[in-house]
Each structure stands twice: as structure tokens, then as C-alpha cells.
Amino acid sequence: MGHKVHPYGFRLGVNQDWRAKWYAGKNYVQFLLDDLTLRRVVEHKCVGGAVARVDIERSGDEVYLTLYSARPGILIGRGGQNVEALKSDLESASGDKIRLTIREVEHPELEALLVARSIAGRLEDRIPFRRAMRQAAFRTMQVGAKGIKIMCKGRLGGLEIARVETVRQGQMPLHKLRANIDYGLAEAHTLMGLIGVKVWIYKGDIVPEVKETSATAETSEVSQSA
């Protein structure tokens, strides 16, 4: 029986970097709980900020938090009011000194989490699920993605029996490690119940530079021996 592997965790250390960078011995559990608390605060306070990713790095008593947002202006606010309010909320929740950095996402259509949240929002607005899925897939492919897969599960269309609907466009090599695949999960809270939305976006292959250097070294050795 097959088991599904998380696309990000499957490629961690190969072509994906850690989103929490710190080391702890006995304080590992406490740091992990603090990270979960920080992520929940960001998710709760930055609803309209379109945050695609949160990176956490610890150095001493300071926590460096980097938010990747498609709407950085909303997160910053007029005169930086929203940033200061968010920073104070994070510091009160964790008890650590927070260094907050906000970076802009150039193409929100290529961020799987933002696409999933967009589809979930449209489902909550009673947009037909097939139309929402196809339009999201079309916009993502127009930006330059090589493949996309969207899966919705729940009482789609108000039916009494839950079912699964899937939309695929382009390629989706889930078994290839060098494939740059982004994954996002969102939930739509409708009158008929909860609908889960999963999105996979294939952005191309990431070829490590080590292979190129090894290939050039082999060619140089062959030329020297000749």
C-alpha cells in the first residue's frame, strides 16, 4: 500500500533549505513549541498580508523572523504601525526579542500556499469549485510554472457524500528529487462543512553545481592522461 510523502520534507537538504535554523540540546522541545506559537501568531494576525512562508532563525536570545509576503504594504502599514504591532504580539507570545524582516514575493501565483488559500477563499464565497480550480491552474501556468496539481476534498457542490476532485496541468514529477515542487494546504469553511484544498506546483529542476564541477574534473583528468 502506497504512502504519500510531503514534497518539502522529501527534498529537505537536497534542493530545499530548512525553514527553522537553530540548534538546541535540552531546550529542543521548548524551542519547537515557541516556533509553533510564532507561526500561529503570524497566521492569525496576518490574514490579509498573503504570507507565503515564515523562516525562523535563532541566535542567542534573539529570534530572526523573515516573512515572505505578496502584500508587504499591508503588513508594514502606514508608518510601520502594523509591523510594530505584530512585533509586540510576537514578543509577548514567545518572550524573546524578535528581529522582524518582510520580503516581497514577486509571483504569488507560483506560491502553492497562496494559491490554495485563494481557492479556499473562493469556495467560501460560493464560487463553483471547478471554476475556481481551473482558473487558479490557468493563472499559475500563465506565469511560468511547468505543472500544477490541485485537489479538493469534501462536500463539493453541497452533496451529502464527500468526494475528491483533481485538476492537473503540465508535468508533476513527484518522485524526482531535483524537481522544485512547492506544496500548500488550505481549508475552506463553508456552510456544508470543511473542504480541504491541496496544491502542488512544479517550477522546474534544480541541478546542483557539484555535478558540473565533477564533470569538468573528469574531462580535465582525461585530457591530462591523453
Write out the residue ranges for each language-model feature.
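RNA-contacting regions in translation and RNA-metabolism proteins
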Residues: 1-226
